């Protein structure tokens, strides 16, 4: 009788154990990253530049997946097309430089800025002024000498064009005195510089590094040293903003990567370069992977990014005012109209 009495208890215990195991499996399956068919999917438009480093880190180290996201990166060769792609629905988020095109679309209510990204800051090389060898030999030696020269940029109203305008304001020459040549892409601008069809170009250091190392152009200086400003941002279409869980999770993963990039890479930068050591190498290798550059070149391409993803809102207002004054951006809206205040952390 004792044996018969124990059997039901044993089976009951086993059943309870099995139920607990199944419950645990169910909890795991429901957690972010457990099943790919349960992840929120999104496409992110970026350039293959170190200024997008946190995006690459979050993707490669699984921070997006930890937040329950399945992110696809779509790469572009200029910043303004990223804003267009977000508006058309080809991508959900954009992470790139502010441009006149972005501001015009945002001013029409199709896009909103949700966070900050790269900044032009002294000591952290990002965009540089570069001279062709012939122009350099003829006397183009410093950024202030660009007045009256043929200067390549990607597009009218791009971050490179704006940087040139800030330089003109600083040194008191007219932007109209510069022959600005919009060549539509970074690769085209670099090729024109090497081919001596322009006197100078504004390029990100990651694009220009190989050209400089090969003796194809001369460095005149860095925008961050001459005219610091809030270069990059994170933005989304109004359609994407309607999905609050998606936006919240995306920014959480990105800020996690912002902090790591800042604390590991930027904190170690001296004389414009990050050291290669056991702490920095893993992140430098990730950046190298996505920018198609060797680690030895990445160390000098470390753009400054706020560790909390903050945005210099007052500088954004200045950008809009300047671009409107030049006729590159439609008038009738101010910075507050293009910011998603629920997400932007002002600096």
Locate the predicted segments by residue.
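Short, glycine-/small- and polar/acidic-enriched structural segments
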Residues: 37-173, 179-183, 199-205, 220-222, ...
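Periplasmic-binding protein-like
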Residues: 119-128, 212-239, 251-254, 258, ...
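Bacterial N-terminal signal peptides
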Residues: 16-29
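Short, hydrophobic alpha-helical packing/hinge segments within bilobed ligand-binding/sensory domains
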Residues: 81-83, 100-101, 188-192, 208, ...
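Sec/Tat signal peptide C-region and signal peptidase I cleavage site
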Residues: 32-36
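Sec-exported extracytoplasmic/periplasmic mature domains
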Residues: 60, 87, 106, 169-173, ...
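N-terminal secretory signal peptides that target proteins for export/translocation
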Residues: 1-14
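Secondary-structure end/capping motifs
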Residues: 242-329
